[in-house]
Swiss-Prot record:
It catalyses: tRNA(Asx) + L-aspartate + ATP = L-aspartyl-tRNA(Asx) + AMP + diphosphate. This is Aspartate--tRNA(Asp/Asn) ligase. Keywords: Aminoacyl-tRNA synthetase, ATP-binding, Cytoplasm, Ligase, Nucleotide-binding, Protein biosynthesis. ATP binds at R218, D219, E220, Q227, E488, G540, L541, D542, R543.
Length: 599
């Protein structure tokens, strides 16, 4: 039986005989003495195999990388000058007495300490990739985060209750993953995008504090921080108001950081959605980046430069400047690179001005656009932006959404660049905040209708109920997002607990009474039985752990993730199924050839 882990062998065990089990990370033959670095989930220990024990030494000679081994030996101090300060076991080594090969290994397709592996190679050989110390560290930290979350919620009276995985398809924003029913021909289940409705029903049922750490599913285009299946820390509580809910779960995240990383998070500023969009063009601003927008829409309405004046005069248009302190030293090729970057977000281009001498007005500026701006506009740009000599101003002028997306992304990109970090535009710290007072609705131009910003079950601010009938665009929601370093870590809201208010929201969304009853009748019925005031939120566990580990991708903190094409390169899912299975499910493929190709 194993007596300890490799990575836990330390000076505390000097002189003791221990039994270890793990994998040969590296084997070295030094003049008749064989050294084996034995590895397990806790780390490495150096094993010394002397030729004095012939049978053991012969077995050691046959060991290769990734052989699974059992080793019995005595812990001793390493010779002076050979210590390794990077390891817990770095001051000791194990003198091998017995060595047993539990299972040999074929030659691995890569070295586990190769840091230049492609993600395709890593995901194809995920079993081996997960043996890498960095991956094991990530997943162990993930476990510790989940454990601390459970401890906190249990201590605060929350009950872990499971909700169904096979449920009803309801409009929640993204596409559902559908599961055909064999028993009920032509009918489909949906995999849950969130347990939203069930947790509200649990509040009506009297379980006033609920949580679960559960899988959710969304069939949407993937990005670096998205997966088709993801893990959510889902929470709901009755009888607490918005401020109390925020306070409790800010405390939870503080507890997790303190317990897992020994980090004390700073205070959480509370910022209204409108302010976040005005200053940063984003509802999840990265406060580590020390640049903000300068609003110029009114200033640009009367300039003789259509690139600025047209969006400034248009309904829903916006013109802003982004001051980059010290940016005057940027080369034209760097500026051109940023111009191409903003086009990804729909911008047509990127106007700029270099400030050589702010005191000289027009004469102290360098830019192809200066000639198109009158003196008053130039003076306003300099004054409002606070531009100084050596600064660079970038401009966004378009529909507000395009400006916010493009210049908001530019702000983050410059801040995170080598230029930004060396120029003091980025502060490496933990920067949390709450964003509150989101709009209740946003207008869908294509469908010419209102859509819920969060979900249709979010309560409006007190006194805003009537705006749903008269002016939905001005209706503010009791919604809140926790943002950390530019990532939405979690989001939630106070929910609607009165059936008549819920019906009003459905009406604003052009969901008629019959459709509402068909899709949400079970909720409307439940709300009539004394539903308590309630609210909650959900945190993305994958995102939280990605931030805490500073991983390059969310896929580095998930044991068996999907690619950006929603494929599993290890198991080759999704995969074709045979005709018999399709017949049982009453399914016929429109394009049978499409179902024949694997990953």
């Amino acid at each position: 039986m194993r007596t300890t882990y490799c990575g836990l062998v330390s000076e505390m065990l000097l002189g003791q005989t221990v039994t270890l089990m793990g994998w040969a990370h590296r084997r070295r033959d030094h003049g008749g003495v064989i050294f084996i670095d034995l590895r397990d989930r806790e780390g490495l220990v150096q094993v010394v195999c002397d030729p004095d024990r012939a049978e053991m030494f012969k077995a050691a000679e046959g060991v290769r990388n990734e052989f699974c081994l059992k080793i019995v030996g005595k812990v001793r101090a390493r010779p002076a000058g050979t210590e390794n300060a990077n390891l817990v076991s770095g001051k000791v080594e194990l003198l091998c007495h017995e060595l047993e090969v539990l299972n040999p290994s074929v030659t691995p397709p890569f070295q586990l300490d190769d840091d230049n592996l492609s993600e395709t190679t890593r995901l194809t050989h995920r079993v081996l990739d997960l043996r890498r110390p960095a991956m094991q560290k990530n997943l162990i930290l993930r476990y510790r985060v989940a454990m601390e979350v459970r401890k906190f919620l249990d201590a605060n009276g929350f009950i872990d209750i499971e909700t169904p995985m096979l449920t009803k398809s309801t409009p929640e924003g993204a596409r559902d993953y559908l599961v055909p029913s064999r028993v009920n021909e032509g009918m489909f289940f949906a995999l849950p995008q969130s347990p939203q409705l069930f947790k509200q029903l649990l509040m009506v049922s009297g379980f006033d504090r609920y949580y679960q750490i559960t899988k959710c599913f969304r069939d949407e285009d993937l990005r670096a921080d998205r997966q088709p299946e993801f893990t959510q820390i889902d929470i709901e509580t009755s009888f607490l108001d918005e401020e109390e809910i925020r306070g409790m779960f800010e405390g939870m995240i503080r507890t997790v950081f303190r317990a897992v990383m020994n980090v004390e998070l700073p205070g959480y500023p509370v910022m209204k959605y409108a302010e976040a969009m005005h200053r940063f063009g984003s509802d999840k601003p990265d406060l580590r980046v020390k640049m903000e927008f300068t609003e110029l829409t009114e200033v640009m309405k009367d300039v003789d430069f259509k690139v600025f004046s047209a969006p400034a005069q248009a309904k829903g248009g916006r013109v802003v400047a982004l001051r980059v302190p010290g940016g005057g030293e940027m080369s034209r090729s760097e500026i051109d690179g940023y111009t191409e970057f903003v086009k990804i977000y729909g911008a047509k281009g990127l106007a700029w001005i270099k400030v050589n001498d702010a005191s000289k007005g027009r004469e102290g500026l360098q830019s192809p656009i200066v000639k198109n701006l009158h003196d008053a506009a130039i003076a306003e740009i300099i004054a409002r932006s606070g531009a100084r000599n050596g600064d660079l101003l970038f401009f966004g002028a378009d529909k507000a959404k395009v400006v916010n997306d493009a210049i908001g992304a530019l702000r983050v990109k410059i801040g995170h660049s080598d230029f930004g970090k060396s120029g003091g535009l980025f502060e490496d710290k933990w920067a949390p905040l709450w964003v509150v007072d989101f709009p209740m609705f946003e207008h869908d131009e294509e469908g010419d209708r209102w859509a819920a910003v969060h979900n249709p079950f979010t309560a409006p601010k007190d006194g805003h109920e009537d705006l749903m009938d008269t002016d939905p665009g001005k209706c503010i929601a009791k919604a809140y997002d926790m943002v950390l370093n530019g990532w939405e870590l979690g989001g939630g809201s106070v929910r609607i607990h009165r059936a008549e208010v819920q019906s009003k929201v459905f009406s604003a969304l052009k969901i008629g009474p019959d459709e509402a009853q068909l899709k949400f009748g079970f909720l409307l019925d439940a709300l009539q039985y004394g539903a308590p005031p309630h609210g909650g939120l959900a945190f993305g566990l994958d995102r939280l752990v990605t931030l805490m580990t500073k991983a390059d991708s969310i896929r580095d903190v998930i044991a068996f993730p999907k690619t950006q094409r929603a494929q599993d390169l290890l198991t080759h899912a999704p995969s074709p199924v045979d005709e018999k299975q399709l017949r049982e499910l009453h399914i016929r493929l429109r394009n049978p050839a499409a179902g024949q190709s694997g990953v």
